[in-house]
Amino acid sequence: MLDLKKLRSNTEEVKKALSNRGEDFDVNVIDEVIALDEERRKILVDVEALKKQRNEVSAEIPKRKKAGEDVTEVMAEMREIGGKIKADDAKVAELNDKINYIMLRIPNIPNPAVPEGETDEDNVEIKRWGEPTKFNFEPKAHWDLGTDLDLLDFERGGKVAGSRFTVYKGMGARLERSIINYFLDKHTFENGYTEVLPPYMVNRDSMTGTGQLPKFEEDAFKVENNGYFLIPTAEVPVTNMYRNETLEGDKLPIKHAAYSACFRAEAGSAGRDTRGLIRQHQFNKVELVKFCKPEQSYEELDKLVQDAESVLQGLGLPYRIVRICKGDLGFTAALKYDIEVWMPSYNRYVEISSCSNFEDFQARRANIKYKNSPKEKPQFVHTLNGSGVAIGRTVAAILENYQQEDGSVVIPEALKEYMRCDLLK
């Protein structure tokens, strides 16, 4: 959520910044919300005047009673003033609802470093690590390798649940689990994160706090009988752990690493990477979440990207980093980097991690603040998160990049102690 004061004081600047944001968003609603806020502010001034008048009239009652005077008219005036205050309070509550409805649907303001552009083709590559894997044979796709090696069962996943669900079997299940453990060990022992194992279901307030609701409700899986939502990412429960809290400034930054299953309806994604493990309704991921002071957040974003890189480098997987353009930035981020791993069967890089700085956008929605001393006025924290990284896509990348001509797959050195083998065959 944006700062309403900023909308009032920098209206045209904000409208310009949001005009090519890539969201289905009409900048004219900013004028609407400002008009509603002005109306609310005028009524609040009237309410304060009425309360002052009521206090003055109220003070007259004991004086008149003491003097033996009739207070009937004064009491009637009190009731009239009270009725006006009640009516104005109702108007303010109605205006608050209208303002909040609009504010929850206004996207974040892009950082000046965000490139211009409309689609993912306009994202700017800023780094490559490793070289795309070359083969002296025709490489297989990960879904064929997984099936041939009896690691992945797409058919039975479809039978028990539906399309875009997968059963991991035998060494495939062990590979998934080994990657999870490797990522968590790397981030907690080497990168300084505290591990969290969060709930996989959250309430509506949590989904609103991180920005999934109200805009993206159609992409969420909802438990209809009690209002819970299955989490699309551990970002949601981990960020909302601190909802409506004021943190101690000297404890920042707070850094959490969380493994979870993730659940996404992926509405509108038909035909896009729907074969194999790339786009699933249920998948595992290790998420990195940070809470920091505003002046720390862009340095912490750089470190977050490096932490996500570290696990891919440890696995020897070639990747590149792109800075996301305005039109592809999404709803909540002020600045975002995607890390894309090389996938031989696609002959291109495929996203495996997104690392974002939300500045105070989520903190305002979730009311997460900090202060450096007990007497200091609380300020909103900045929140960041990044995939550290997606597990299923890592499985796919390992199968494709480490495959051998005979159809076997070499285990990356970093995973051998977890897998207790050197080769999948």
UniProtKB/Swiss-Prot annotation:
Binding-site positions, L-serine: 233-235, 287, 387
Signal peptide region: none
CDD domains in alphabetical order: SerRS_core
Pathway recorded for this protein: Aminoacyl-tRNA biosynthesis; selenocysteinyl-tRNA(Sec) biosynthesis; L-seryl-tRNA(Sec) from L-serine and tRNA(Sec): step 1/1
PROSITE patterns: AA_TRNA_LIGASE_II
Pfam families given in the database record: Seryl_tRNA_N, tRNA-synt_2b
Binding site for ATP: 264-266, 351-354
Compartment(s) where it occurs, according to its Swiss-Prot or TrEMBL record: Cytoplasm
Highest taxon, organism lineage: Bacteria
A cellular component annotation (GO) from this entry: cytoplasm
A GO term, aspect molecular function: transferase activity
An example Gene Ontology biological process: selenocysteine biosynthetic process
SUPFAM superfamilies membership: Class II aaRS and biotin synthetases, tRNA-binding arm
Catalysed conversion reaction: tRNA(Ser) + L-serine + ATP = L-seryl-tRNA(Ser) + AMP + diphosphate + H(+); tRNA(Sec) + L-serine + ATP = L-seryl-tRNA(Sec) + AMP + diphosphate + H(+)
EC number: 6.1.1.11
Main location: cytoplasm
Annotated HAMAP family: Ser_tRNA_synth_type1
Record-stated family: Belongs to the class-II aminoacyl-tRNA synthetase family. Type-1 seryl-tRNA synthetase subfamily.
Function of the molecule: Catalyzes the attachment of serine to tRNA(Ser). Is also able to aminoacylate tRNA(Sec) with serine, to form the misacylated tRNA L-seryl-tRNA(Sec), which will be further converted into selenocysteinyl-tRNA(Sec).
Subunit structure: Homodimer. The tRNA molecule binds across the dimer.
Protein name: Serine--tRNA ligase
Organism: Clostridium perfringens (strain ATCC 13124 / DSM 756 / JCM 1290 / NCIMB 6125 / NCTC 8237 / Type A)
Lineage, broadest ranks: Bacteria, Bacillati, Bacillota, Clostridia, Eubacteriales
Encoding gene (name): serS
